[in-house]
C-alpha cells in the first residue's frame, strides 16, 4: 500500500459553536484514523494556540501551513468579523489560494443571509439537514461518516496532481 498523504486542514469556526465542532471533529478523527489514503491534522485555534502566544499570529501561521479549509458554517461563523476579514479571504473571493470544504454546522438561510462568498459552493449537509438539526448521537455520527466519505473524494480530487 502506498504511503498516506498527510494533510493539514484549517478549521475556522465561531467560538460559540465549539461544542458542536469538537463533537464533529472527534468523529472525523476516528474515521480518518482508518483511512487508507489520508492522514489528517485538523488545525483549530482552541487546541493549537498555546497560552501566551499571539492568537492572530498563530492563526495566520496555521492558515498559511494548511492545505485546505474545513469551514464550519453557522450564523455565528458568518457574523464573525475576524473570520470574514482574516480567514475566509484565503478560501473565497479574489484572494483565494486554498481549496475548501464547507460544512453546514448550524442552519443558515441561503436566500436571506449573506453567505460571505460561500453561496456558489456546495455546503455539506446530511439529506438537507445541518449538523445541529440532527437530534440523536447516531444521526450525528452518520453525518460525520458521510462527511468523511465526501471529504475523502474531495481530498483525492484536490491532491490528484500534487
Regions found by a protein language model. Name each.
Residues 1-68, 91-98, 106, 138-162:
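Conserved N-terminal substructure of TIR/SEFIR domains
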Residues 18-19, 78-80, 133-134:
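A generic structural signal for short coil/turn motifs at secondary-structure boundaries
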Residues 21-23, 81-83, 113-114:
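A short acidic (Asp/Glu
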Residues 71:
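Redox-cofactor binding/interface segments in oxidoreductases and associated redox assembly factors
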Residues 75-96, 108:
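Conserved TIR/SEFIR loop-to-helix hotspot centered on a Trp-containing motif
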Residues 101:
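Rossmann-like NAD(H)/NADP(H) cofactor-binding core
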Residues 108-123:
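Glycine-rich, charge-decorated loop segments at or immediately adjacent to ligand/cofactor-binding or catalytic sites
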Residues 124-141:
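Short secondary-structure boundary motifs at beta->alpha junctions and helix caps
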